[in-house]
């Protein structure tokens, strides 16, 4: 007889089964509603954050642009200030050198005045008299000493102010370099975007680095540097004007005294011998030719230095262009032009060197002939009278130093710190 096999397990009631189905359906609806709410909120959040991010990026880009403009304006002002400062330094240096040259030039009239007094001590008997010539010579010495003191004071002031200008220039240069670096950094930041390959997360990027300043401190610092530079340049301009005035006044005083002294000497002047006059004329022309040739040699040397700088520039450009990447390393018109420029400069430099050597050979020949002329002049100068020697010595006050060499240095003079190149050459030739 067959039997019913029933699996032993828990049996739920039908209401439980309905309740379970209802709960599953209800929970599914609730989960979908919650998910829908989250999705809507997420979309709103995405829109808001995207808009905020875009606005923030645009706002900060605008701020970077404005900051770059501000820094660039300051950089341009510093550029102008540095240019003006360099020009003022050059101008003041030239004025200081001019004052120094004028100061050095006062040694010559002082030597001449003392030499004339020494020469006139050789007078004998009744001629040893305190005459107007001697009075004017003593007065000339006093005027020269006063002018040297005034010029030395101006040279010292110019040197001190040049030190201040160099200090200001260093500060302006430091500020200018800082702004150049800042512009490079900010322009690099401005060029970045979401697709830039070198963007990454950084450790604590919002930190405030040590040494940070406020915007007002930054502006005050730049303004202070600019104001200080302008103030020092203004003071330098005033100093240059004062130096120029001092030079003019001292030269006028010395010239007036020279005229007065030579007026007293004029009645004592005698004519030179014909041969001496001829030799002196030849000496003068030779000195003028030497001066002109020296000037041409200086111009040749300057041109040669300039051509070397141009050659360095061309070499540097050619070398730099060898580092162009890949197919960019092409022999374009710029490459051919730079190569031609190098060849042209090398030929020019060779021609200038050849002409410079010829000019120096000609100068040596002129110096040798000048030495022979002066030896003959020195022999004939021994026969001149004392007052004639005095007037001949005083000719050095009206003839440029590089064009005049005394025939005979017979008497003790005040000591010059350095000899001119012309005198040194003559000593070597002798």
UniProtKB/Swiss-Prot annotation:
Swiss-Prot/TrEMBL keywords: Cell projection, Cilium, Coiled coil, Cytoplasm, Cytoskeleton, Flagellum, Microtubule, Phosphoprotein, Ubl conjugation
Coiled-coil residue windows: 82-160, 273-379
Subcellular location: Cytoplasm, Cytoskeleton, Cilium axoneme; Cytoplasm, Cytoskeleton, Flagellum axoneme; Cytoplasm, Cytoskeleton, Microtubule organizing center
A Pfam short name: Tektin
Major subcellular site: cytoplasm
Post-translational modification: Tyrosine phosphorylated.
UniProt-listed GO biological process terms: cilium assembly; flagellated sperm motility
Domain of life: Eukaryota
Entry GO CC: axonemal A tubule inner sheath; axonemal microtubule; microtubule organizing center; nucleus; sperm flagellum
Subunit record text: Microtubule inner protein component of sperm flagellar doublet microtubules. May interact with CCDC172.
Chain's role: Microtubule inner protein (MIP) part of the dynein-decorated doublet microtubules (DMTs) in cilia and flagellar axoneme. Plays a key role in the assembly or attachment of the inner dynein arm to microtubules in sperm flagella and tracheal cilia. Forms filamentous polymers in the walls of ciliary and flagellar microtubules.
Similarity comment: family membership: Belongs to the tektin family.
Name listed for the protein in its UniProt record: Tektin-2
Organism: Macaca fascicularis
